[in-house]
Amino acid sequence: MKKLALLLAALGVMSATTFAAESALRITNVGQEVEIENESGGSNIGESVYFGTSVGLAYKDWTFGVIGAKRWNVDTDDVDSVTGRVVLDAWKHYDNYKLGFRFRSEKDYDRYYARGAWNHGMFWGSADLWYEAKSGKDVKGNDKNDTWRGEIFPIGVQYNGIKLGWFVDAEIVSGSVADGYREQNFEHQLRLYAPLYKGEKLTLTTQIRHTLTVDDKFNKENVSKESRYEDFGRTRVYLESDYKVNEALNVYLKYGYEFREKEYVANGKSDENKNYFGDLIFGWNYKF
């Protein structure tokens, strides 16, 4: 009887310890990332050079993320600080879908996101919807316009690691817009994700984004100095590599190149000044 009592007590301690461990907020991963975006006609190195540190956490069926970052405009002759960035994420996970919230703050705006994603058999989808509250003045000295934005995959299909999704990028500007500036934009794309190689440590994948249609509206198009993407006017291709250093640590490198055709809003003539875009991303991630 005494042995049984001791065994039950030991099981009780183990169960309590396990429950406490599962119930505690824990760190799941940490990482750092550099992203360099460069457009033809811009800075020699990158108009947007981003460096960020991220921490992932989990609590029961919730996951959280915290990102602190800095962004610069980098030329061979000069480095200009552009903005800092703070991002807070929270996700509630269910059987085959999840719902979340994101707050993102930079020097010139704050964003408030509602997020969702689902995955069921061969089908999947996701949506990031946000309100962007801007600060500062526009070109005419008026307060900058807030915007409603959305990046949505209404539906996608997947099979053996290959994913194909219909993507919608939507923007609606709140309030009156200065002459020549965009009031709204809806861009439809097809996006393909596919594995290329998988070894013991090295994995190679690709991502292809192809624009189908662009439907936008400008206030007084005839005076606009902006340019827009033509229908079927851009294709971006990423080559992505991930190397598993050990069970916990991986490093990655990605490069994207965008082929584009743009036209001036006012007269429909081709914009040859911005026909190139490159995106270089590299970083590391450590899982606990």
Predicted regions and their residues:
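Outer membrane beta-barrel transmembrane domains
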Residues: L99, R191-D271
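Outer-membrane beta-barrel pore domains and translocons
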Residues: E33-E39, I67-N73, R102-E106, D128-G136, ...
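Extracellular loop and loop/strand-boundary signature of outer-membrane beta-barrel proteins
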Residues: E39-G41, K137-K144, S174-Y181, K220-R228, ...
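Repeated loop/turn-to-beta-strand initiation elements of outer-membrane beta-barrel proteins
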Residues: D61-V66, H93-L99, G121-L129, Q158-V168, ...
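Residues on the lipid-exposed face of transmembrane beta-strands in outer-membrane beta-barrel proteins
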Residues: F51-Y59, V86-K92, A114-H120, G150-Y159, ...
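Short glycine/proline- and aromatic-enriched beta-strand/turn motifs that initiate or cap beta-hairpins
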Residues: A20-D77
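Outer-membrane beta-barrel "beta-signal"
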Residues: E272-F288
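Outer-membrane pore/translocation modules
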Residues: A69-E183
